[in-house]
UniProtKB/Swiss-Prot annotation:
Catalytic activity line of the entry: Exonucleolytic cleavage in either 5'- to 3'- or 3'- to 5'-direction to yield nucleoside 5'-phosphates
One GO biological process term: DNA catabolic process
Keywords for the protein's UniProt record, in alphabetical order: Cytoplasm, Exonuclease, Hydrolase, Nuclease
Keyword Disulfide bond carried by entry: no
Enzyme Commission code: 3.1.11.6
Tree of life domain: Bacteria
Organism whose genome encodes this protein: Brucella suis biovar 1 (strain 1330)
Functional summary from the UniProt entry: Bidirectionally degrades single-stranded DNA into large acid-insoluble oligonucleotides, which are then degraded further into small acid-soluble oligonucleotides.
A single MF term (Gene Ontology): exodeoxyribonuclease VII activity
CDD domains the UniProt entry points to: ExoVII_LU_OBF (cd04489)
Protein name as annotated: Exodeoxyribonuclease 7 large subunit
One GO cellular component, as annotated: cytoplasm
Localization: Cytoplasm
Quaternary data: Heterooligomer composed of large and small subunits.
Length: 511
């Protein structure tokens, strides 16, 4: 018994509890004492909602840490999306978990710890995304001048979508496709990013046409209301969009990160509609003005061409002038040909008369008498020999007489006359061919003149460069940096300024 008395309080009246009892007592004490509390702290260990919709994380400061949980119902009512490292004010009740002797706060409401905390988080995110190049002006795309389809990412109800559709209908009616999203709350950012990515994945020839420009719009609100448009996934989706994006979030004084990533920022949703489409009446007026100017320019152009044609026609010699020299040469050739034919005919006639005199019958008769006399003399001495010889000579004479007949000469004379007639016909044909050849040459010269004119060269896509005095520039070495030049195309002149002089290519390049 003495040994039992050595334990202090062993026989005292201190109540004894089991572990479950003391844990339950602590739970009731904590919940009764701290029924509703407001706790300021920094979110730590936040990984987003669980698959069940609940969120588990901790609130901490520089000296302590408090576990926290938000049930799914409370999570859906939050007006902003919790972020790791965000300083918040949480309203809820403290409770314990007897199974592990831990206590935690069950959060019913939560809000950022003032605008300063959100602004600090916003500035940190802005600098980080800017360092990645998501706000680079080089990534900005030009808006199409006349889009066929416009995609709008906004709430399907409310004044914003009505203002956009009304403004587009007034300016230039076209097809508008609305992708409905929540524009506030925890799911705002993911829904907007999904909508932007969804529009970009639409095929060009699908049942739903792919928009040519996107408008992401929301009305004005507080920093907390617009916080979903500062979400990192929204910024990345807009920066990666292949479709130009117009940001129209809040009023003109409201700025969100989507404004920096978008290709164009509009002060209001109505302003976004005005940026997206032109005014149809203005286009019609501009088209009429351009049409009138084009008609006037064409009239002036044709007038100039007519004047140039008349001037060229006056400068060209007439057909009589072109044919004067060939005609003179032809007349001279014809005159020489006539004289030559006459002289040749006379020569042939004299030659023919000479042959005719040689074939006179009187001379033949005289020669025959002489031969008969000789034959008579010879016949007295050698009758047989003479008779044979006479027969031989008579035969030879007959043969020669036949050869000396005037018929071949007459036939040749007729042939010469036929040749003269052919020459006369050939002369007439040569004159006609010469005239045709001169006519074709004249037409070729006319076509050549039109081809070699510099207006036709301009029509083939070339240009003529003139200096400040209006003189054509023929060499690149004549152009100095800063010289004012005029480049004449087929449809007008363009003034330019030379940025550099003659550039001599390096012969070593390309080897």
């Amino acid at each position: 018994m003495a040994s039992d008395s050595s334990f202090p309080g062993a026989s005292s009246n201190v109540a004894e509890y089991s572990v479950s009892e003391i844990s339950g007592a602590l739970k009731r004490t904590v919940e009764d004492t701290f029924g509703h509390v407001r706790v300021r702290g920094e979110i730590s260990g936040y990984r987003g909602p669980h698959s069940s919709g609940h969120a588990y994380f901790a609130l901490k400061d520089d000296r302590a840490r408090l576990e926290a949980v938000i049930w799914r119902g409370s999570m859906s009512r939050l007006r902003f999306r919790p972020e790791e490292g965000m300083e918040v004010i949480a309203t809820g009740k403290l409770t314990t978990y007897p199974g592990s002797s831990k206590y935690q706060i069950v959060i019913e409401q939560m809000e950022p710890a003032g605008a300063g905390a959100l602004m600090a988080l916003l500035e940190e995110r802005k600098q980080r995304l800017a360092a990645e190049g998501l706000f680079d002006p080089a990534l900005k795309q030009l808006l199409p001048f006349m889009p066929r389809v416009i995609g709008v990412v906004t709430s399907p109800t409310g004044a914003v979508i009505r203002d956009i559709i009304h403004r587009i209908s007034d300016r230039y009616p076209l097809r508008v496709i609305v992708w409905p999203v929540r524009v506030q709350g925890d799911t705002c950012g993911p829904e907007v990013a999904t909508a932007v990515n969804g529009f970009n994945t639409l095929p060009d020839d699908g049942p739903i046409p792919r928009p040519d420009v996107l408008i992401v719009a929301r009305g004005g609100g507080s920093l907390e209301d617009l916080w979903g448009f500062n979400d990192e996934i929204v910024v990345r989706a807009v920066a990666a969009s292949h479709i130009p994006v117009i940001s129209a979030v809040g009023h003109e004084t409201d700025w969100t990160l989507i404004d920096l990533a978008a290709d164009m920022r509009a002060p209001t949703p109505t302003g976004a509609a005005e940026m997206a489409v032109p005014v149809k009446a203005d286009l019609q007026a501009s088209l009429a003005s351009q049409s009138a100017r084009l008609s006037s320019a064409m009239s002036r152009f044709f007038d100039q061409k007519r004047q140039a044609h008349r001037a060229a026609a006056r400068a060209m010699p007439s057909a009589d002038q072109l044919l004067a020299l060939p005609r003179r040469r032809f007349d001279e050739a014809a005159s020489r040909l006539t004289r030559a034919l006459f002289v040749n005919t006379q020569k042939k006639r004299v030659h023919f008369d000479g042959h005719a005199r040689q074939l006179s019958p009187r001379l033949l008769q005289r020669r025959l008498v002489e031969l008969e006399r000789g034959v008579t003399m010879l016949g007295q001495r050698l009758p047989r020999a003479l008779e044979a010889f006479l027969r031989e000579r008579r035969t030879a004479f007959t043969h020669r007489a036949n050869r000396l007949s005037p018929e071949p000469i007459l036939r040749r004379t007729r042939l010469t006359g036929s040749t003269l007639e052919q020459l006369d016909r050939r002369r007439d044909q040569a004159v006609r061919l010469l005239i045709e050849r001169v006519k074709r040459r004249s037409q070729e010269l006319d076509r050549l003149m039109r081809t070699l004119s510099y207006e036709s060269v301009l029509e083939r896509g070339f240009a003529v460069v003139f200096d400040a005095q209006g003189k054509p520039v023929k060499q690149a070495a004549a152009v100095l940096p800063g010289d004012a030049l005029s480049v004449r195309f087929r449809d007008g002149d363009v003034g330019v300024v030379a940025r550099a002089g003659l550039t001599i290519p390096d012969p070593t390049k390309g080897q």
